[in-house]
Amino acid sequence: MPPAPPIAAPETQPTPATEARTTPPPRPQTRPSPTPLPQVPQISDEIIVPPDAKVMYRETGWASWYGPGFQKRKAANGEVFDTEKMTAAHRTIPLNSIVRVTNVKTAESVVVRITDRGPFVGDRILDLSRAAARKLSVYQHGTALVRIEVLQTPAPIGTGGRWCVQIGAFQDPNDATKLKEKLGRRYRTAKVLQFSSPQGGDWLRILVAEDDKKRAESLIKETHTDAAMFLVRLD
């Protein structure tokens, strides 16, 4: 609410970008720790798309990839994150949705499952696993303009859901603590959590009353901070 694994020659390991640019800086992006939700059974690696699947939602924007620091950690849907599985992170598409992702420039396309929340950097809309990033030519460049098409989802996209606000990253933990205390006094029905990212920096997550989307959107409008603020779906 604001992140890498036999061939003939060693493979160069690029680093995820921190900005949506042609030549991203050589350092991994900072992403917050995955949401601590209850453990769920691991789902099969195979992603099956019904032949009659219709596109339920479209979005175009910048995608990056993540992995360093998050391998074998719990993702937002409760699974253990694996950089070699075809998964991705999105801030608002329901978890476990099946999504087709197309590189606008190269026309390369893959199907992934949304298992995590993010990215929490600028105007990016999607964070890909390393495996998915390789197939979309995102791995080498760090970012790419992509088109997202939701093909299957376990819950409605436009209505319902459980929502929160994520703020960060704070390089000084004291700044995060001060804002946490301020928000706690102002929104007594909300729960404010403070946590650290594996890549560094502190984050705040504000759980609004009844996990209501409109309450979360209002909180974003009413809160003044230099840190980035993100509307995040929890389920």
Protein language model regions, located:
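Secreted/periplasmic proteins
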Residues: M1-K178, F195, K221-E222, R233-D235
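Extracytoplasmic
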Residues: Q171-D235
